[in-house]
Amino acid sequence: MTYMLLIIGAIILAIFLGEKFDVNAGIVGVVFAYILGSFMIGLSTDEIFALWPVELFMMIFGVSFFFNFANENGTLEIIGHHLIYAFKNHLFWLPFGFFFAAALISGLGGSIWGSVPIVGFLALNIAKENNLDTRIIAIAVIEGALAGGVFPFGPLGAIVQGLIASTGFADMAQEISWQLFIVSTIYPILLLLFLMFKDRKNDAYKQVELKAPEAFKPKQKQTLTLMTIFIGIMLIFPIIDNFTGGSIPFIASISDSLNLGLMGIVFGVIAYMFELADGQKVLNRTPWSVIWMTCGISLLIGVGVQVGITESLAALISYVPWPIIPVTIALLCGCMSIFSSTIGVIAPLFFTTLPALYATTGWSPTIMAVCIIIGGFAATVTPFSDGGSLLLASSGYLGKDQKDLYNTLLFRVTPFTVGSAAITALTLSIIHSI
């Protein structure tokens, strides 16, 4: 228990120091991992180096390297505009245009850091010009970006798979990733439907005028083709292998050899050779801050795992009444996510507890993983977290408009999304218990 408090305290202090001195919390996490690991726990430096999450690092880098070609040459932005424009004759459903545009851009490599600024700027200015409900728009853009981000072959999906692969449920990593993606997509869609039908008497949508998007240029068409091939390969061989039960050795061998991060690097090099975008600018887009945040905190947690912090945390959670453990996890992750990153901090901490949680509580690791993510994502809409701060920064709003958006995110959107995540977690736990 002492080590658990020490490691959690180190994580909190790393986040605080990162904010205070504008340094990446993951780098501070590496410092604490070294100090605590070597001088207090007694690990050798070789043992600490061995805890560095190599597969997680390669997954984030590989996926971002390839998909950043589509980000750099404008393919993702045009895809988003085409998707929004498809709703020109169905303007009541326009929030779903924003949702799916953000999800698609995020899932195809833009991640939340690319999709929220692209779609958010367009959506919020349409909202301002036509007096649309910014609560609906904010949820559509941010939750769409988050849902698309956990697409198993997307940037956040790669991180999730890498984190799960480091637990005792590595063989379930892809299955859990797909279920996370499905739940993370369905539940915000239900939220939007609820809010939209409450707002159905608002005639403002009828006044919206959408501009026709640009046509795809040759390089963008080539990029789109390469992305389709990449996703096809990553999907088709595992599906055939599962369908045939591994009875075709050639297919089984390819399926076992496919690695999301390494395949991303392969396709990134192909895109580089075809000059689909300026290669140096693509490399400059590498999300090093995310890589350092996630891997650095994972290293610190890895040091704690060596002295049993996951078992201690799971034992502490097991004192919660069994039926409400999933809801408690979702709310706890939601509260933590207000001031920290779900993928960079919360997921590395709680995913490591999945084997111990399963052993002590009997709850399915899939249910627990889903509750961790949807709980964390629910509070990402706050102005202090990734989604809300990105939306504020990219809105183009000034003065009173910006203050109103800030208040909407903090007081109207956050309680609604966190409460909805708790209800979703409760619903999933009831279904699982039947």
Predicted segment positions?
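Hydrophobic transmembrane alpha-helices of multi-pass small-molecule transporters
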Residues: 1-59, 67, 182, 189-309, ...
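Hydrophobic alpha-helical transmembrane segments
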Residues: 4-9, 27-30, 92-100, 114, ...
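Transmembrane alpha-helix interface/packing and boundary motifs in multi-pass membrane proteins
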Residues: 14-23, 101-111, 142-151, 331-345, ...
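Membrane-embedded alpha-helical segments and adjacent helix-loop junctions characteristic
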Residues: 43-130, 137, 280-359
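Alpha-helical transmembrane segments
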Residues: 55-62, 175-189, 255-259, 366-382
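Transmembrane alpha-helical segments of multi-pass membrane transport proteins and ion-pumping complexes
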Residues: 60, 68-73, 90, 94, ...
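Membrane-core helix-loop-helix motifs of multi-pass transport proteins
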Residues: 126-217, 364-371, 389-434
